[in-house]
Amino acid sequence: MFKHIEPVTIPEKKLFFEFKEKEMVNKLHRMIGKDNFNLLTQRLEKQGMKKGVTVLLYGLPGTGKTETVLQLGKTSNRFIMLADASKIRSKWVGETARNIKELFDEYRKTAKDLDETPILLFNEADALIGKRHDVADRGDQEMNTMQNILLEELENFEGIFIATTNLVDNIDKAFDRRFLYKIRFEKPGTETIFQIWRTKFPKVKPAILKNICSKVTLSGGQIENIRKKVTIDTILHEHFTVNEAYLMELAQQELLLENRIHLRHPIGFTRK
């Protein structure tokens, strides 16, 4: 139902955010650092408050929500337990609810076995915490039962729980107060996007990257896709040269599914 991600296996990545997101992400890094987290949980417990930290990261695809959680795990040296929604949900009566219970039981067991409290990550959480409907069939009843258990688990949660979603409007309102922090990830502005381009393509002239940024607005995830395509073409074609036309064409391709543009020319790379 989930996989363990060890902090040492997570590649370090520099992430770029707009001011508000950066401020909140930095707060999360400070909160779950070993010394601060232990102090926070002790103080909260002393004041009769629940010790769990629950966070919802929401916003457009490719804005760094999942990678943010991975970097939180790396910098705080915490294991990440990544829940697999497709394996939690079951067609068998009662099994989805049992799976949720087993997941949290396993989290508690793992937390006792480790030196540092792990992070429980529900990626694309709308599959599990989407809006509930009137019970029309057994599937609806099963989903509602599972969500009631999940609500109860989060109400009494002790640890670090982070959920991500691209579809915040689909999340059931009952989960609103279960999240201590709700952080919105916007598509980065021009200057932030330029910094991402420079990090991904340090050998390309800044003027070229600035020109691309002024014409095409992409997310960090889309720029990473371009970087991967460039790497593939560099491997496949000897004496491959990256030029502005080639990068612009790849940038435009990333927007095809958003129905913003239509390609009219072949990809403009040069090779000998």
Please place each PLM-identified region on the residue numbering:
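C-terminal alpha-helical "lid" subdomain
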Residues: 1-12, 178, 187-272
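Charged, amphipathic alpha-helical linker segments immediately N-terminal to NTP-binding catalytic cores
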Residues: 2-30
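Walker A/P-loop NTP-binding motif of AAA+ ATPase domains
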Residues: 19-214
